[in-house]
């Protein structure tokens, strides 16, 4: 399929740029890579790609179906349609990303990406295999209503994902006026950090103005060096375990809860919530 071919070429590019980053880090005498962590990251990327290529996901409602049933307009694929759709995808991704951080049951879909205590291009490959159900279809209803063709969405979704790779690096510092427009390495370092001032900030994927609009922006501070990872460290390099460790912990905590109400509530409460 076209997606399989795109993934193959993208992975070649990703690996090449990781080597360049490693060489640059040696020249600059900065410790950027840890071998076991890097192997864990690459393994996560490979398993995620296998899941995608084998189509091991359950799509509750497809964009094709929404387009066929909800489209008010019929528009052809032109350059402005691609731009509009890209902004729509980026807006949807802001909210999927934010909700994955904010709710217990959804955090398991994303924890693997934040589990590394390093921050480098390999870290970008840490993608989940535990998000079996595609639940965020409703965020694409506005695009379907406008009549954005499914072909446009199919082309843009992998491009939007691949465009999030480059800013997972410590080697690029401030990018001047671009800091006000797009997500930069500085913005995303903040997002991956567990320092109190940085937690739950900078959810945007491509355009940083979503964080400005919705009150989740935080600038990287020279006085606050980012500390990476998750608040409850994985303490393992095994990507399969990391993918499901939060889900396992929720099951254990739900069993321990004294009230049936709490056994159910724990899944849908904010990340970190536990019964008193």
Indicate where each model-derived feature is located:
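Cytosolic-facing loops and C-terminal tails of multi-pass membrane proteins
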Residues: 224-276
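Membrane-interface helix-loop junction between the first two transmembrane segments
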Residues: 19-39
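Membrane-embedded catalytic scaffold of the fatty acid hydroxylase/desaturase
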Residues: 45-55, 71, 76-228
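Hydrophobic transmembrane alpha-helical segments in integral membrane proteins
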Residues: 1-14
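Alpha-helical membrane-anchoring segments
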Residues: 51-62, 258-261, 274
């Amino acid at each position: 399929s076209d997606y399989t071919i795109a993934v193959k070429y993208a992975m070649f590019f990703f690996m090449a740029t990781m080597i360049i980053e490693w060489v640059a880090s040696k020249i600059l005498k900065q410790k950027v890579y840890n071998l076991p962590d890097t192997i864990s990251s690459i393994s996560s990327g490979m398993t995620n790609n296998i899941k995608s290529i084998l189509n091991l996901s359950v799509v509750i409602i497809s964009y094709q179906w929404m387009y066929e049933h909800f489209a008010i307009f019929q528009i052809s694929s032109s350059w402005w349609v691609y731009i509009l759709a890209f902004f729509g995808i980026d807006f949807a991704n802001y909210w999927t990303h934010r909700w994955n951080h904010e709710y217990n049951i959804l955090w398991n879909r994303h924890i693997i990406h934040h589990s590394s205590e390093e921050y480098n291009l390999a870290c970008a490959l840490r993608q989940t295999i535990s998000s079996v159900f595609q639940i965020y279809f409703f965020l694409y209803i506005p695009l379907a209503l406008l009549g954005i063709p499914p072909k446009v969405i199919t082309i843009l979704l992998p491009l939007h994902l691949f465009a999030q790779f480059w800013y997972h690096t410590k080697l690029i510092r401030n990018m001047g006026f671009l800091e006000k427009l797009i997500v930069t390495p500085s913005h995303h370092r903040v997002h991956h950090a567990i320092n109190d001032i940085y937690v739950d900030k900078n959810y945007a994927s491509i355009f940083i103005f979503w964080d400005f609009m919705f009150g989740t922006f935080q600038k990287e501070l020279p006085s606050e060096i980012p500390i990476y990872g998750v608040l409850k460290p994985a303490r393992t390099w095994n990507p399969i375990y990391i993918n499901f460790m939060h889900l396992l912990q929720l099951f254990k905590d739900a069993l321990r809860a004294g009230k049936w109400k709490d056994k159910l509530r724990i899944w849908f409460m904010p990340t970190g919530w536990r019964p008193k």
